[in-house]
Amino acid sequence: MITYETWDIEQKPTFPIDNNEKGALHVLSWAYDHYSDDLLYACSFGIEGIVLIDLISQVRDDAEIVFLDTHLHFPETYETIERVKQAYPRLRIHLQTPSLSLAEQEKQFGAELWKTDPNKCCELRKIIPLRQAMTGKKAWISGLRREQSPTRQHVEFINLDKKFQNIKVCPLIHWTWKDVWRYVHRHNLSYNPLHDRGYPSIGCAPCTAPAYTEEDLRSGRWAGLGKTECGLHES
């Protein structure tokens, strides 16, 4: 088994990439065969997440999925989660919350930490909760795509994740923005309506703004704060 402790780049499996959908299903099938219940999907319920959930359900209909509930998300995001639960009732969808409430965080670190120290806010409300959710897991799935941003251009299907000392599985690395939307429309999948209002990438409400450029689909995240990642995908 490929784990963080036994990682050997020469042992990584290869997958067909002539068809993105089949390729993603091959990656997911390998991952669930390889890790079974030791595999977790950390989903933001953005448009890539909607695609991955549909693909995962074809491979493992009772897969474990975690949403990092920072208590700062848009109402539309929570509504999307409820619709997904109804559409895929066997999936085990869990909302992982931070140990600090927003009031406790403000008391300890000051008001609007997402403005004064966004990295600390992401650490408290995303990174630490994901560590807790991944306790005992050997691998996790992410919806990263190479096209999303310059920091993601070298992501592979199977990655050594030094931050979480885990294996990170990324089935959608070769998918384009258009590929994602073609799949959504072809399968008539329900998605977050904020995508239709100029939000290609959706995170916490205070740190997410519309981004009307396909050149950088994440330009609406942490705008003006010199930050493009929450820290989950940084080594």
From Swiss-Prot:
Cofactor note: Binds 1 [4Fe-4S] cluster per subunit.
One Gene Ontology term of the molecular function aspect: phosphoadenylyl-sulfate reductase (thioredoxin) activity
Claim: Membrane is one of the keywords in the record: no
Active site: 230
Name of one Pfam family that matches: PAPS_reduct
Residues that, per the record, bind [4Fe-4S] cluster: 121-122, 204, 207
Location(s) in or outside the cell: Cytoplasm
Reactions this protein catalyses: [thioredoxin]-disulfide + sulfite + AMP + 2 H(+) = adenosine 5'-phosphosulfate + [thioredoxin]-dithiol
Biological processes per GO annotation: cysteine biosynthetic process; hydrogen sulfide biosynthetic process; sulfate assimilation, phosphoadenylyl sulfate reduction by phosphoadenylyl-sulfate reductase (thioredoxin)
Swiss-Prot/TrEMBL keywords: Cytoplasm, Iron, Iron-sulfur, Metal-binding, Oxidoreductase
Principal place of residence: cytoplasm
Record-linked InterPro entries: APS_reductase (IPR011798), PAPS/APS_Rdtase (IPR004511), PAPS_reduct_dom (IPR002500), Rossmann-like_a/b/a_fold (IPR014729)
Known role: Catalyzes the formation of sulfite from adenosine 5'-phosphosulfate (APS) using thioredoxin as an electron donor.
Protein name: Adenosine 5'-phosphosulfate reductase
Species this chain originates from: Anoxybacillus flavithermus (strain DSM 21510 / WK1)
